């Protein structure tokens, strides 16, 4: 029975592939209904993983509608090292993430993975056609875009980084100068082997309340006026308030519910009252 089932699955996937090649528009209609089951197959049907990788589709920063991994690869820049993606949230939130701009500015396409299963399945895939699939909200993804100038800015920012880390304590794993922010003062990422903050939130909502707490890494933009002003401040209460707002607004920007929304508003109001 198992061999019959396997043969049937392979034949069905072959028909899907034929449809995707012969009638892409009709296949896109099909994918709106069956993209998720195909993605689930990546996790549960290893023998057909290569075929499934050709069949699944994603949204992208470069075009409307869906794209395949194969089409993404064809559009890659010659100096591009990885297939970049961002998962964990609805499409609108992901597209507005401050993490995306640095990659777009360098001409790197980012796949928008707005299905909650993406954050679970895609990390298990690892590579497509020998190219690494890299989440841009992981700490190591910045290595692909970091410049020597960024490294110099990081050295110069050490005093303000320490201020923020001392203020936030164990709410963050570390505070680092960002190479991927231009307009925003801060963003959050996670260590390579840690689940994203969005995944942690999703798993807890599903009832897995005994998960260990993985703290995020806070990245700050050394060129942003808020960070430059913070570097000049000695008022410990103000430093604490600004640091908390920098973290909480970074979480909110990624669609994450903050633990103390009332405290966030109070600290934001305190900052406004002292600066206006």
Where are these regions (language model features)?
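Conserved GHKL (Bergerat-fold) ATPase module
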Residues: 1-276
């Amino acid at each position: 029975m198992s061999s019959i089932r396997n043969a049937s699955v392979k034949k069905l996937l072959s028909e899907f592939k034929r449809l995707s090649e012969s009638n892409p528009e009709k296949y896109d209609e099909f994918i709106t209904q069956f993209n998720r089951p195909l993605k689930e197959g990546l996790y549960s049907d290893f023998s057909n993983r290569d075929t499934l990788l050709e069949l699944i589709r994603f949204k992208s920063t470069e075009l409307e509608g869906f794209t395949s991994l194969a089409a993404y690869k064809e559009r890659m820049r010659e100096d591009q090292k990885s297939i970049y993606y961002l998962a964990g949230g609805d499409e609108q939130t992901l597209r507005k993430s401050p993490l995306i701009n640095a990659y777009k500015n360098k001409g790197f396409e980012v796949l928008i993975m707005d299905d909650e299963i993406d954050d679970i399945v895609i990390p298990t895939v690892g590579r497509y056609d020998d190219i690494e699939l890299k989440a841009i909200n992981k700490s190591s993804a910045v290595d692909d875009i970091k410049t020597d100038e960024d490294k110099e800015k990081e050295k110069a920012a050490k005093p303000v980084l320490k201020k923020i880390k001392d203020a936030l304590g164990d709410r963050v794993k570390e505070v680092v100068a960002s190479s991927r922010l231009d307009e925003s003062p801060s963003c959050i990422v996670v260590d390579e082997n840690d689940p994203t903050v969005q995944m942690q939130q999703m798993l807890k909502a599903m009832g897995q309340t005994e998960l260990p707490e993985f703290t995020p890494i806070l990245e700050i933009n050394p060129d942003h006026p808020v960070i430059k002003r913070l570097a000049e401040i000695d008022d410990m209460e103000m430093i604490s308030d600004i640091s908390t707002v920098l973290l909480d607004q970074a979480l909110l920007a990624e669609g994450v519910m903050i633990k103390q929304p009332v405290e966030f508003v109070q600290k934001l109001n305190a900052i406004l009252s002292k600066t206006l």
